[in-house]
Amino acid sequence: MGPGQPASTCVHLAPRTQLDGRSDPKVLQTQNQLQFNRNVPTHSSNLAIRYSCPHAIRIEKLKHSYNESYHCKDADCRVGPDLGSSVSFSVISQERLSYAVHLARRDVKRRQFEKHIKEHHLRSQPQSSQKCGHTKYKIPDHRVERKESKSQAACQCSHQPSKVEISSSGAKVYLYSSHPGQSDLTVPNSPPTHDPGLQPHPRIGDHKNISEQKSLLEVQRLQKELSSCIHKIEEVTKKDRLEEALDPDEERRIRIRRQEQAARSARMLYVLQQQVKEIQEELDKLSPHKIKHTKKSWAMSKLAAAHRGAIRALQMFVTQFTDRGEHPLPARCKELGSLIRQLSLCSVKLDADPSVPDVVIDILQQIEALESLLEKKLSPKKVKKCFSEIRSRFPIGSQKALERWPSTSPKGERRPLTAKDTFPQETSRPSVAKQLLADKYQPDTELPETQRLQSELDVLDADIVLEEGPFILDQSASFKDEVLAVAKTKAGKKKPVTENVPFRKKDTLAPARQQGLRKAERGRQSQPHSKSRVQQTTVSSRLKMNRQPVKDRKAPWIPPNPTSPPASPKCAAWLKVKTSPRDATKEPLQQEDPQEESHLTGAVEHEAARLAWLDAETSKRLKELEELKAKEIDSMQKQRLDWLDAETSRRTKELNELKAEEMYRLQQLSVSATHLADKVEEAVLDRLKPLLVKAQRVNSTTEANIHLKDGSSVNTAKAQPAQEVAAVDFESNNIRQLDDFLEDCASELWAVTHAKILGSETLATVEDSKDSPDLEIMMRRMEEMEKYQESVRQRYNKIAYADPRLWMQEENNDQKISAISEKPLSPHPIRITKTVDRKDPAVNIMLERPCNGNSLDESVGTEEGSEKREAPLLSLAEDSQQKEGRAPLFVPPGMQHSIGDYCSRFEQYLRIISHEAVGSFNPWLIAESFSEELVDEALGAVAAELQDMCEDYAEAVFTSEFLEAAT
């Protein structure tokens, strides 16, 4: 890979022996290893990788003569002393050598044929037509001279000695240097790596739009890739692959590589599917009658990109197939075939080139052949038979489309040529070159096209029969049928033109023969000479057979495809042209076989019917899928609506049940609270009556003693001082005893009252810890109900699917936080203290009950007081008789007044906490009516809000579940 010499890394086996004839054990270990040449200089250019266009065939001569080896030794070409015993040459099969000789002979005969055509054209052209038809023949003469100069230059270049180089192994290498004028024949598929400079613009009469050419080129590339894919699969299935025992690491690597290949192929198929879908949508949007140029070019560029993606997917598929062998392939090959079918149909809809339908038909046939071949790949004996049957079923377009393909791929030239994959594929390509040469230099008015083609093929193939017979005996029939079919269709569309009519580029319509062949010429003008191979041997003999005259001429049948665009105005004009007398005279001269015509027509009709059936079946399946989709969406919407109705009814029923339970609970609470208050009041009064009786008795006893003392004090005012001291002591003792008794009584009364109150509260808490017979408690309960309603509303609005356990935990936490009861507090106990000793013990006691403004009913209080005053007087003697041995207490008037005041206030407190009905004032009726109104209003508002919320929730769920999913 040096700058001035080619890469010459010699790889060979180098066994060595010792002098005694025995093998060296160290050498035996490495004799089967590859020995690389280390004489290559360590230059930076040798480490770089260079890519270039494929070179010509490189042939190295064998070193069998002593002179050559001696010459090489003198020229210092031999690198090492051990290279004399090694034999270094390029191994070329006999088939490739014979094929190269055949191509050289064909090129020589082609040049002879061009000279013959030119001489015949110059002799047959009269002087008058040279003056009148100068414009007509000006361009062909220029082309002839240009081609002649190119052919002469090619001959001179071919006769010049090739460049001789000597490799490091000592062998002579003849390198072929191509002529610079022929560089325009090859158009590689790779993008340009440099600026090509100014290119001559193609003429409008000779070339179509660039986008159409690119689309046609991509379709033909896909066709060629399909054919190569089929050949490779055939080769793989024909070989008997033996399963070798692999290491676990190797098996793991193979498995990982296959998984990566499967993932990559899946991504490629997905991208290709999306591209096909976008192209189909764009084609559906485009009108078949009026299509803007920008939209059409955009669609064609996308179609070409999709074709390139399909080619890459095919190459990956073939790689996986050859890697896996007999392992089962995934089902993506069928999907790839369907995508290629859709791409082909899109190409037919979009392209106006008449050669596209033929290529598409061949692609569809190849896809069917590929699928059937993959289905039977496990039985290699049946593969060849199946494929031959499929090719016999579809004889139209297979070879014809292959011969339209210009071989421009560098990979195809680098691939080694063998008889299996070269000859059957390349045998039908020379027909294009023959037609082009015949139509360029032959006047339109000499002979009918069929006879002209026969004569040209006779001249060209007369000398090739003996040379190429063993290669192509089985390919002549299909070639002959296709050549005649092309001649018939183009002779039928041909418009009569005289010699004197000048040729115009844009204004007039050229003959159908020239324009039809120019369309084919654009797809074939870049075909290299190394790929245009003539291998049909029996064509001339078969074309010389007598043909029956054609009685009627039929226009080619157009398949009734509703989705394909209508024919162009030029094609429509050609179809409507009436037959002229000149055409009538030419009809008896055109000869063809009725059986072959019927066979071709039947095959074309069969293929057109199959395409129409495929379109109808595709539209039918799409319609069925749309109907199924609509039905499924309707059923899903119906199910969702039914579920929403059922859920709404269930929620409403639950709310009604909760409302009824709450009302019943409130009623029970009101009844139980009333009974509880009555019981507490009765129990408190039962415990307080004995204490009140005792207090009244003590009061009455004290008053009697005071009266007696006053009377005795008047009579005995001048008694002894010792008696006064005894009386004072006795009075102080009585006061002390009374204070102790009152303290004990007050403490017992306070304990009993609090025990009753706490017992009532405990009982109410046991029944319902949250409910009490107070109005504020009911208001608090209503607030709790509103909070619960708000939580329900938030739950419906948020649509949060939380855990029910979390809800229960939150409710338990709320229940633990009990509301602070604002009950009226009980009065503090009376603290009775001793009064200050007064000097004058005489006190006027007023036995009257003081008026209390806070009392609810004074009349009731006075009546109760009179009853309490009268009762102790009656039972005072009985109590004194029953309780003998106890000292009576004498209470002063102030203390008695305080005791009475305390009793009245205590009764008022009991009346407040018991909610006793006093006159027309009944607090329980008011509280019950107020609570019922509040509950009714709250429940009505909650029900209305819940109804609105359920409707909003249903609408939101329907929108999110169905409308968004449908769009």
From Swiss-Prot:
Biased composition (Pro residues): 557-568
Subcellular location per the Swiss-Prot or TrEMBL entry: Cytoplasm, Cytoskeleton, Microtubule organizing center, Centrosome, Centriole; Cytoplasm, Cytoskeleton, Microtubule organizing center, Centrosome, Centriolar satellite; Cytoplasm, Cytoskeleton, Microtubule organizing center, Centrosome
Domain of life: Eukaryota
Any one GO CC term of the record: cytosol
Disordered: annotated segments: 178-201, 401-431, 490-601, 849-872
UniProt keyword terms in alphabetical order: 2Fe-2S, Ciliopathy, Coiled coil, Cytoplasm, Cytoskeleton, Disease variant, Iron, Iron-sulfur, Joubert syndrome, Metal-binding, Phosphoprotein
Functional note: Involved in centriole duplication. Positively regulates CEP63 centrosomal localization. Required for WDR62 centrosomal localization and promotes the centrosomal localization of CDK2. May play a role in cilium assembly.
Annotated protein name in UniProt: Protein moonraker
Naturally occurring in which organism (per UniProt): Homo sapiens
Gene (name only): KIAA0753
